[in-house]
Amino acid sequence: MRVGCGYDSHRWAAKRKLILGGVEIPHEFGLTGHSDADALTHAICDALLGAISEGDIGFQFPDSDPAYSGISSLKLLSKILEMVDKKGFAIDYIDSTVIMERPKLMPYIPDMKSKIAGVLKMPSDRINIKAKTNEGMGFVGRQEGVAVFAVALVKENQD
């Protein structure tokens, strides 16, 4: 078994959609980024890449490459699943924490889990998403942006 840790953060931006876990969440702001800026999916991507020793999302999908401009992060996650499979691993479990002051995410978490599970071809009960605030502290507390942490557990395929 291997463990990977992931982290991502993005600034708030006007005139952008807020996408987390592949789900569009109604909010006055979205997040800045070269892709759809889905910080939750990006952190999960980094956790998986770490678990298989394949760098990070910026290395695999550089923001200097126009092919990734505006791309759905779920498509990137799908490509990473292929890498996990090719390296002889299977995803066992994912845990993540989204840190933002608002909006409240609880109503959207089941849909996020379902979308991520669908892409990763695994049961949604093997994916956990927690939503926290930063109690008004730091850049998240000042509502300048969002931060996400993720951990992925992978195991060697037994084929």
Swiss-Prot record:
MF terms (GO), sorted A to Z: 2-C-methyl-D-erythritol 2,4-cyclodiphosphate synthase activity; metal ion binding
Cofactor, how bound (note): Binds 1 divalent metal cation per subunit.
Keywords: Isoprene biosynthesis, Lyase, Metal-binding
InterPro entries: MECDP_synthase, MECDP_synthase_CS, MECDP_synthase_sf
Binding-site positions, 4-CDP-2-C-methyl-D-erythritol 2-phosphate: 8-10, 34-35, 56-58, 61-65, 139, 142
Keyword Metal-binding among record annotations: yes
Binding site for a divalent metal cation: D8, H10, H42
EC number: 4.6.1.12
Annotated coiled-coil segments of the chain: none
SUPFAM superfamilies found in the cross-reference section: IpsF-like
Keyword Lyase appears in the UniProt entry: yes
Co-factor requirement: a divalent metal cation
Any GO BP annotation: terpenoid biosynthetic process
Residues with site note (Transition state stabilizer): H34, T133
Catalytic activity: 4-CDP-2-C-methyl-D-erythritol 2-phosphate = 2-C-methyl-D-erythritol 2,4-cyclic diphosphate + CMP
Involved pathway(s): Isoprenoid biosynthesis; isopentenyl diphosphate biosynthesis via DXP pathway; isopentenyl diphosphate from 1-deoxy-D-xylulose 5-phosphate: step 4/6
Family: Belongs to the IspF family.
Job description of the protein: Involved in the biosynthesis of isopentenyl diphosphate (IPP) and dimethylallyl diphosphate (DMAPP), two major building blocks of isoprenoid compounds. Catalyzes the conversion of 4-diphosphocytidyl-2-C-methyl-D-erythritol 2-phosphate (CDP-ME2P) to 2-C-methyl-D-erythritol 2,4-cyclodiphosphate (ME-CPP) with a corresponding release of cytidine 5-monophosphate (CMP).
Record text on subunit structure and interactions: Homotrimer.
Protein name as catalogued: 2-C-methyl-D-erythritol 2,4-cyclodiphosphate synthase
Gene: ispF
